[in-house]
Amino acid sequence: MPTVHPHLAKRVWKVVEELGYFPNTQARMLGSGRSRIFGLIVSEITNPFFPEIVHVFEEIAVQHGYEILMTSTVHDRERMKTAIRRLLEHRVEGVAVMTFGMEEALLEDLKVRNVPLVFVDAVGPPRPRVSNIRIDYLRGIRQAVQHLAALRHERIAFITGPLTLKSAVARKDAFIESTKEIGMALDRQLIMEGDHTPKGGEQAFAKLLALPLRPTAVLCSNDMTAIGVMHKSYVEKIAVPRDLSVIGFDNIRFSEYILPPLSTIQMSQAELARLAFQALLNDVKRETPNPHGTEYILKTNFVLRESTAMNGHKALRSTRAL
């Protein structure tokens, strides 16, 4: 069976990379030069936030005669590089990058080939054929903080996502700004870093419980974190919402089915998918690219359910305090 010497293979791939060559797997696209494929990159398909985006994006794509090529990076740079090569091999017409913080430098291969891109909360100077969906985190978080203040909560904790993510930092900053707007004293001890998982929510809430004065309300950077907080509350026999008010973020599908139903901040996955697809389609159809790119705004809204209640007592002193 014929084989290629490893040294020769390495030299060939080096030349391929230097020339920027990627094989066309679409059979020359039947003379049209168009693949009618959009790429979709998400962070973690196991996170309940993302399947809804994938589903809606694909539904809209089918309606417009497009296919999608989807990949998940799990916040891994090497997986992102592999994903980009795969997308280029398939001659995608555009890519929606729904990673909420992946380094844009890794996407330079797509930019230099004038492949239309759409990001969420992108930073940096505007560029042609690069659209940005800016999330208005402040709107929904402000509503949630004002709601808790109206319920007489004065010690409101905030559990962030991984602060390596721009979106997590933006949500934390929105929380701080919202507390300042209503004149609430900010206690930095009440801001804990999480990792957007139930386990991370449990661990962060355990640290809050160890404080001399516990919070009476917890606002979480996503719903999965809030679910972890509620589970830890159950284990510690802290009743939600009687003893602790909890608010999530994202409004994932099953947030209304947990007990008690979770009050949360809605960031519509369906609308995010719709905006992302429309941004790519607009760029594909546009003969002259917008030199400054295009920005779209996605608003957030507070959704009231049953996980918050009036604070009938002062902040509880921790039984674990020394």
Language model feature labels by segment:
Residues 144-182, 189, 292-307:
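An alpha-beta-alpha
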Residues 1-36, 321-322:
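N-terminal helix-turn-helix DNA-binding module of bacterial transcription factors
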Residues 75, 98-143, 164, 184, ...:
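Flexible loop/hinge segments that line or gate small-molecule binding clefts
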Residues 11, 48-63, 140-147, 166-185, ...:
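Short, solvent-exposed amphipathic alpha-helices that sit
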Residues 205-321:
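Flexible loop/turn connectors
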Residues 133-158, 173, 177, 198-207, ...:
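Hydrophobic alpha-helical segments within soluble ligand-binding/sensing domains
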Residues 23, 32-46, 60, 64-66:
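Interdomain hinge and pocket-entrance segments immediately C-terminal to HTH DNA-binding domains
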Residues 59-108, 116:
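Central regulatory/effector-binding core of bacterial HTH transcription factors
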